[in-house]
Amino acid sequence: MPGSVGRQGTLVAMLRPPVRLTLVLVAVLFAVAVLGLGLLRAATYDPPPPAPAPASAPAAVVPAGGQTGRCGDVPVQATRQLRGMWLTTVMNIDFPSRPGLTQAQVKAEYLRWLDLAVAQRHNAIFVHVRPSGDAFWPSAYAPWSEWLTGRRDGRSPGWDPMAFMVAEAHARNLEFHAWFNPYRGTQPGPDGPGADFGKLAPNHPLLRHRDWAIAYPAGRTARLYFDPGNPAARAFVEDAMLEAVRKYDIDGVHFDDFFYPYPEAGQDFPDDASFARYGKGTPRAQWRRDNVDTLVREMHDRIRALKPWVKFGISPFGIWRNQATDPKGSPSNGLQAYDDIYADTRKWVLRGWLDYIVPQLYWQIGFAKADYAKLLPWWTNLVKGTGVQLWIGQGDYRVGEKGAWSDPAQIDKQLTLNERYGVQGQVHFSAKQLRDDRLGAVTRYRDHHYAKPALVPPMKQLPAAPPGAPKLTAAARDDGGRLRFTTAEGTGPKAVSWALYKVTGTVAVLVNTGRTGSEVTDPAPGSGPGTYCLSGLDRSGNEGPISDPLTR
């Protein structure tokens, strides 16, 4: 997971991480392994017509007034870095804590996770909203998730969790990335229905369209998958995900590493029927890659046509191919996404089908078969000149294992390498590990690398409409010691969020951010006077000119 961890949990034995034999970690790793890390529209599904050509991003708007990048006589200084965590719903790994909670309980738990994100100085959250052919919103394409309702009958919980989650994330100035598993249809038994159609919700699409379903692997750990090689199944899962894009004000569409399933020894994915019908003489491995490529390309194009400001990104397995297999590959010796799960991640970047990529580098620095310090530069070189942002998937779940992961500084050191190589963000797996803070590792890297707030890095391919310079008109201390500002909007496009700077020596540093409409404050102004400036940002993170200074 984000299906990621499961992804790594399914590595071949030579890359399987060592396990610390404590009850907590055993439970986490078990859950990770399981990850593999409304009514339907009609009984017969007709795929939609091809998506129109993607809308091109308009040229950047240059607003008038204010100063660009300066607070009075000094430059402003802000870190541009995506910071987030995966909030995993399948098997109730992170959230909700158990199935069948009341609306009030679910909401309270979610708000605590957002409080954690704010305390970590994150600016995004990645929420698992389609874990297994189900939904955390009222959907015409999928049953309600049993991990939310506690039932497998598809009945509504009577409220809309997605609307609540998006609104509350935005209220805290967190981007909301909706995390989907496109092809996974069920979880294995005994907790999930496995490959037993009789245990599916009555409105599960695979019950209506059994020709779309493939069971894999054989035996007790079987799941049902939407067949990636069936064009009607592919169109359906695209429509199911785009329903959420259409209905909700999300900031990103996010996939993890699960496309074709990770291979089981001695068992090939049983897609003979669709290969015979649609393969058209293409070698099966290439045909499978083509199927996944088509999903990725079509999702990119359809998101652009529907809401061009919504980001599209994928968090793949951390190895594309090994150099021993392909000279373009990485200096590694592990499972290969290209060959083993038919995910040509390198191609997706080079073709510009993604806005960001989050490779799961869940190995330690110095690990011989997959060295973090060697894989990181491979990925940074891949994205150069493409416009695709590189964020790294960090393996917080491994902290506390034997060996290198018993060092609380392991992720701290990895983030130092990320900064050295110009990585533009990190996403941590998973939320529960950040809350538990084993060995104090999370506190350590937060204090070293996330000590100050950060702005989301803008993307040139997205629409740009930076607002005009706002105004700081007054400031006063409240009873809690915060400095509260009175502001006025600038001219031109409306700001989506704000950034507050305070002059410190020869620069003005970022001290706080917030959503437009929220109170502008400096939470720790100190006892003496200070000089401040304010800016507005558009939806894509483009900053407008800075206000005139206000000294208080």
Label every model-predicted segment.
Residues Q120-P157:
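Aromatic-lined carbohydrate-binding/catalytic grooves of carbohydrate-active enzymes
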Residues A135-G150, R184-G219, D257-K280, A324-L335:
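Aromatic- and acidic-residue-enriched segments that line the glycan-binding/catalytic groove
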Residues A108-D134, K247-G252, K347, W353-L354:
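Catalytic domains of carbohydrate-active enzymes, especially glycoside hydrolases
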Residues D522-E543:
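Beta-strand-rich modules
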Residues Y445-G492, G541-R552:
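Pro/Thr/Ser/Gly-rich low-complexity, intrinsically disordered linker/stalk tracts
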Residues R80, T88-A108, A178, Y183-E243, ...:
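Active-site-adjacent "subsite" loops/lids of carbohydrate-active enzymes
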Residues R277-K328, L335-K402:
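Glycoside hydrolase catalytic-domain groove-lining segments
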Residues Y342-A368, W379, G385-L462:
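Substrate-binding cleft of secreted/luminal carbohydrate-active enzymes
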